[in-house]
């Protein structure tokens, strides 16, 4: 691995494709920019840790859910889809992007040149829209429990639609991504002989900007706004429900339960937004005016933003699985290579799973304090 983040080529400009989500050109002038070996080593350790945690965490989550028949509900089906897409991101995005950013050329062949950005874009789109479907399921469960509720069949149809949309929106990478030695043709240095770069060749800059702007809305701002609205409505409904029970419940118990629910809902939205915000800003700035970013700071800044976004592949299994007691219990069997036990009688209802208990204003007025406590506890388990 080359320790330099940029190649010094006298009187020539070399174009690279660095973005994992939005392909683009970057002209490197006659700058002598180096990343310290200590920095490269630190980044390599960080990327390695994220890859290991992302692959093992999502793989464990998928196996645990698929092994337990009683866990195959709407939310868990969507969680498996989310984990599978995150697994692809951890495998396809992290190692290839990290190596290519630090090297001065592409070494993975023409097929991977096209497949890498295509699979990355597909995986990211699937991950984000899986979060959207989970938000929709929660919204219907809490806001409209007596109305339409998604079942397993709806979940499978939704997943199929997501993958079709993801593949369709990612096709430009498959079409316009090219492997070429064009930037090195006029370079006389031996170090650049038989070297290739992988970048996109859109028909024009306007086509490229239109496409990357569409991805910006499709993969970040649109889903984020929708998810925020869903969780805000859920928060308002739960807060109103808690206020109706103020006089019938122990105040300490009510406060702790409300706090747990609110923290979980807030964490889900914040984790998604915070992880992807740096890379989104970087891509947007670079698309419209790459000269704003100093040449010598480009690689390091991109890797830090990219690494932050990839941390989301580790965060999701924690929020959507490992904070639940069922997964903590099953993980002990998973990592000890023991068989999973069937727990039909004592299996705790997984957080966020669909249940058929709802609370109306009439039932709140008529129910006893003991019954209310039980109903509210069941409702909390649905989140």
Swiss-Prot record:
Alphabetized Pfam families for the sequence: 7tm_1 (PF00001)
A GO biological-process term: locomotory behavior
Residues bearing the modification Phosphoserine: 368
Residues bearing carbohydrate: 2, 11, 17, 186
Lipidation (S-palmitoyl cysteine): 338
InterPro entries according to UniProt: GPCR_Rhodpsn (IPR000276), GPCR_Rhodpsn_7TM (IPR017452), NPY1_rcpt (IPR000351), NPY_rcpt (IPR000611)
Cysteine pairings via disulfide bonds: 113-198
Localization terms from the record: Cell membrane
Membrane topology, record value: Multi-pass membrane protein
Intervals, Cytoplasmic compartment: 66-76, 138-154, 233-260, 321-383
GO cellular component: neuron projection; plasma membrane
Primary site of residence: membrane
Record GO terms (molecular function): neuropeptide binding; neuropeptide receptor activity; pancreatic polypeptide receptor activity; peptide YY receptor activity
Residue intervals on the Extracellular side: 1-44, 98-116, 176-211, 282-299
Keyword annotations of the record: Cell membrane, Disulfide bond, G-protein coupled receptor, Glycoprotein, Lipoprotein, Membrane, Palmitate, Phosphoprotein, Receptor, Transducer, Transmembrane, Transmembrane helix
Transmembrane segments: 45-65, 77-97, 117-137, 155-175, 212-232, 261-281, 300-320
Record PANTHER family: NEUROPEPTIDE Y RECEPTOR, NEUROPEPTIDE Y RECEPTOR TYPE 1
Role, per record: Receptor for neuropeptide Y and peptide YY.
Recorded family membership: Belongs to the G-protein coupled receptor 1 family.
Protein's name according to its UniProt entry: Neuropeptide Y receptor type 1
Species for this entry: Bos taurus
Lineage per the UniProt record: Eukaryota, Metazoa, Chordata, Craniata, Vertebrata
